[in-house]
Amino acid sequence: MSANNMSDPRRPNKVLRYKPPPSECNPALDDPTPDYMNLLGMIFSMCGLMLKLKWCAWVAVYCSFISFANSRSSEDTKQMMSSFMLSISAVVMSYLQNPQPMTPPW
C-alpha cells in the first residue's frame, strides 16, 4: 500500500473544493420555467373554474406538477402550493358541477 502512495501524483495540499458561482453573477443559471408554469397553471385553473372547462383544469394540474418539479429547493413553496391547490380545486369543482366524462375539445 505504501508503494501506491509513493507513486500517487496527487498533492492533498493543492486540492480545492468546487464552489458553484452565485446566481446573481450569472443570470443564465436562473431558469424561468417554474415561474412560467406556475403562471400558466393559475391561468388555466381560473379558466377551468370560471368557464367550466375540464381540459383547462387538467392542464392546470399538469402545469403545477411541472412547476413543482423544476423549482429549486431553496425557493419559497407557498406560491407553488397555492397554484397546485387551485388547480386541484378546479378539477374537483368542474367534476362536481358536471360528473360526466370529459369530452375532447376538438
UniProtKB/Swiss-Prot annotation:
Topology versus the membrane, per the UniProt entry? Multi-pass membrane protein
| Transmembrane parts of this sequence | 33-51, 53-70, 75-95
Which Gene Ontology terms of cellular component type are present? endoplasmic reticulum membrane; multi-pass translocon complex
Please indicate the ranges of residues that lie on the Lumenal side. Answer: 52, 96-106
> What are the alphabetically sorted keywords of the record?
Acetylation, Chaperone, Endoplasmic reticulum, Membrane, Transmembrane, Transmembrane helix
Protease recorded as keyword: no
GO terms for biological process, alphabetical: multi-pass transmembrane protein insertion into ER membrane; protein insertion into ER membrane
- Identify the residue ranges that face the Cytoplasmic compartment according to the record: 2-32, 71-74
Q: Which GO terms describe its molecular function?
A: protein folding chaperone
State the similarity comment: Belongs to the Asterix family.
Protein name per Swiss-Prot or TrEMBL? PAT complex subunit Asterix
Q: Which organism is it from?
A: Bos taurus
